[in-house]
Regions:
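Short loop/turn hinge sites at secondary-structure boundaries
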Residues: 1, 45-46
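Short, basic/aromatic recognition patches
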Residues: 1-10
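C-terminal binding/interaction regions
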Residues: 4-5, 48-138
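Generic hydrophobic/packing signal
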Residues: 9-11, 42-43, 66-70
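Short beta-strand scaffold segments in enzyme catalytic cores
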Residues: 10-14, 18
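Generic structural signal for well-ordered beta-strand positions
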Residues: 21-22
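A short, polar/charged loop-to-alpha-helix boundary motif
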Residues: 28-44
Length: 138
């Protein structure tokens, strides 16, 4: 039905002081990428309207990929690391990744293997709803 909303994959993350941060799938980012960017922006007190990574940085990376339509968390972390060399705000935000250790996160879908590995490497505890990320899997 036209009146039904399109289902969006989302991850919610509880920060150490209890604030809940969410990340949803966008045209460029996976939900895991979005939630981590949003979390480090919150911890760094970077306003929501400021992009840590410009779409002009992300789009060429995405064009190199043929089998997926969003950038994984690992790809976004690499892009942040590269950009941090010339951008002190990004460098400061990346330092906040350590604060996410042992935080709890909940996904509305089964997180893809690549994002799952990246979240585990950040030591984030994740639970998932039993819904596939993509209908192509079914």
């Amino acid at each position: 039905k036209a009146s039904e909303k399109k289902k969006t994959n989302v991850i919610a993350l509880e920060l150490p002081k209890g604030k809940i941060i969410t990340g949803k799938q966008t045209d460029l980012l996976s939900p895991a990428s979005s939630v981590i960017i949003n979390a480090i922006k919150e911890l760094s007190k970077i306003p929501d309207e400021i992009n840590l990574l410009s779409p002009t940085i992300l789009e060429p990376i995405l064009k190199l990929r043929k089998n997926n339509n969003t950038l994984s968390l690992q790809e976004v972390l690499i892009a942040l690391a590269v950009c941090s060399v010339t951008n002190p705000s990004i460098a400061s935000a990346l330092e906040k990744l350590e604060v996410l250790k042992d935080c709890e996160a909940q996904a509305t879908y089964i997180v893809t293997n690549g994002d799952l590995k990246a979240l585990k490497s950040l030591k984030i505890n994740l639970t998932c709803e039993p819904n596939f990320y993509s209908k192509e899997i079914m």
